[in-house]
Amino acid sequence: MTSAYDKLHSTLDVKAFGRVAVLYGGKSAEREVSLKSGAAVIDALSTAGVDVVAIDVGDDLLARLQSEKIDRAFIILHGRGGEDGSMQGLLECLGIPYTGSGILASALAMDKLRTKQVWQSLGIPTPRHAVLASESDCLQASTELGFPLIVKPAHEGSSIGMAKVNSTQELVAAWQDAAKYDSQVLVEQWIHGPEFTIAVLRGQVLPPIALGTPHVFYDYDAKYIVNDTQYRIPCGLDSVKEQELIDLTARACDAIGIEGWGRLDVMQDEQGRFWLLEVNTAPGMTDHSLVPMAARAAGLDFQQLVLAILAESVATRG
């Protein structure tokens, strides 16, 4: 990765990026995380000499993009309105190149149910699941999937609205809570075993990271607030299993159409089998975030990572 980046860096002219809008903040439930990610990206690009315009996305976005004469956009919005294909569609209508995945891949990845359906159709392992829309759905899922289970809003990130449950009563309560965030709620089989997260950058898979947390799972607090989460790089897998994980990640990304950069979450069960959970097309870039951590393990500092993501928008969208 370092040699590939060195080749990129040797030919990189930051002036070629033009006037770059960093789109961050927004109105989703992940706004606070996006504000932190955006601030870090803005600082890195500014320090590198890029002409940056910071735009906290609101109702005046279209006017700002036009009045600021934006040439390119770095999307660091998390969640709905920025990571679900809608922002990508707006930018394409305006003819503004942008970072990350396109409209379809962004929309697919934001929809946990559709992502799982694509993976299942291609034989890519993902935990069994059910859609919850009523108490009777909860009862049926309890019977068909057993316990423990994990409940998820279908279109939220950062583990917002998620809960592990061990009984039908807990499942009903968790469904009702998740439904406050999303009209569509999923429940999945709980996979017992270690969790891994794998970042991808410019078509390459970065070193996998093993996660350890004293929390029930890698939730919002573990991701962004507390400092008791353990990260292991190298991830502790033997070379054969690590390569299997890398190959599975690449296959899963290709299935969704991930471009530029992203991050996948994977569980390994007690039999050593891997299970894909979900994919993130605009991962966090805070001081707790995993993509910068994986990039460091591959030899890239934060500024190099940000420039590599931005440079990919030139390669793919001009």
From Swiss-Prot:
Residues 116-311 form the ATP-grasp domain. The gene is ddlB. It is found in: Cytoplasm. Mg(2+) 1 binds at residues 265, 278. It is an enzyme of class 6 (ligase). PANTHER family: D-ALANINE--D-ALANINE LIGASE, D-ALANINE--D-ALANINE LIGASE B. InterPro entries: ATP-grasp (IPR011761), ATP_grasp_subdomain_1 (IPR013815), D-Ala_lig_Van_CS (IPR000291), D_ala_D_ala (IPR005905), Dala_Dala_lig_C (IPR011095), Dala_Dala_lig_N (IPR011127), PreATP-grasp_dom_sf (IPR016185). Its EC number is 6.3.2.4. Binds 2 magnesium or manganese ions per subunit. One of its GO terms (cellular component) is cytosol. One of its GO terms (molecular function) is D-alanine-D-alanine ligase activity. NCBIfam families: D_ala_D_alaTIGR, PRK01372.1. It catalyses: 2 D-alanine + ATP = D-alanyl-D-alanine + ADP + phosphate + H(+). Mg(2+) 2 binds at residues 278, 280. Belongs to the D-alanine--D-alanine ligase family. Cell wall formation. Keywords: ATP-binding, Cell shape, Cell wall biogenesis/degradation, Cytoplasm, Ligase, Magnesium, Manganese, Metal-binding, Nucleotide-binding, Peptidoglycan synthesis. Its cofactor is Mg(2+); Mn(2+). Pathway: Cell wall biogenesis; peptidoglycan biosynthesis. HAMAP family: Dala_Dala_lig (MF_00047). This is D-alanine--D-alanine ligase B. Its main location: cytoplasm. It comes from the Bacteria. ATP binds at residues 142-197. GO terms for biological process: cell wall organization; peptidoglycan biosynthetic process; regulation of cell shape. The keyword Cell division does not apply.
